C-alpha cells in the first residue's frame, strides 16, 4: 500500500519531467536569401545588359528583413526599386517593401508583417530595379532561400 501511494505521488513529477525534456522550444532563426538581378527575369523581359545582386537575411524573432544590394550597367539612373510579392517566378505582383536605390551599393532593413514573412519564406518575393527607360523594371530576380 505504501509503495502504491509513493508511486501516485511520483508519477505526476515524472510526467512533468518528461514533458520538459521532450518539449521542442521554438528558437529564433536567421534565414538567408539571394536574388540575381537580370533583364531576362523581368515580365516582360527586356534587352538591358544590366545586372545586380541582392542578399538578405530575415530574423524570425524580430521579423526584420535586412538587405544589401548592388547593380551595374543600367540604361540610366535607378528611379525606384522594390521587393514585390506574392508572386511566383514569371508573374508580377505589387510592392511589398520599397528599397531606396539612389546609388549602388545600397542597404537597409524593414520589419515585415506575418503575411509578408510567410510569402517571403515561401519563395514568392522578387526584387526589381526601375529606370526611366524601363519604368516597369529594368532588372529583376526572385529571392531564393539559403544562398
Task: Enumerate the predicted regions with their spans.
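Cleavable N-terminal signal peptides
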Residues: 15-16, 26
Amino acid at each position: 500500500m505504501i509503495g502504491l501511494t509513493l508511486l501516485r505521488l511520483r508519477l505526476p513529477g515524472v510526467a512533468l519531467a518528461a514533458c520538459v525534456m521532450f518539449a521542442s522550444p521554438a528558437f529564433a532563426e536567421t534565414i538567408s536569401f539571394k536574388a540575381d538581378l537580370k533583364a531576362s527575369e523581368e515580365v516582360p523581359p527586356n534587352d538591358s545588359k544590366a545586372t545586380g545582386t541582392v542578399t538578405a537575411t530575415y530574423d524570425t524573432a524580430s521579423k526584420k528583413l535586412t538587405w544589401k544590394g548592388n547593380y551595374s550597367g543600367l540604361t540610366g539612373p535607378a528611379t525606384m526599386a522594390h521587393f514585390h510579392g506574392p508572386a511566383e517566378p514569371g508573374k508580377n505582383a505589387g510592392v511589398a517593401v520599397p528599397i531606396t536605390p539612389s546609388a549602388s551599393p545600397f542597404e537597409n532593413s524593414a520589419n515585415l508583417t506575418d503575411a509578408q514573412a510567410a510569402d517571403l519564406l515561401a519563395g514568392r518575393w522578387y526584387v526589381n530595379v526601375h529606370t526611366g527607360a524601363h519604368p516597369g523594371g529594368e532588372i529583376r530576380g526572385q529571392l531564393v532561400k539559403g544562398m
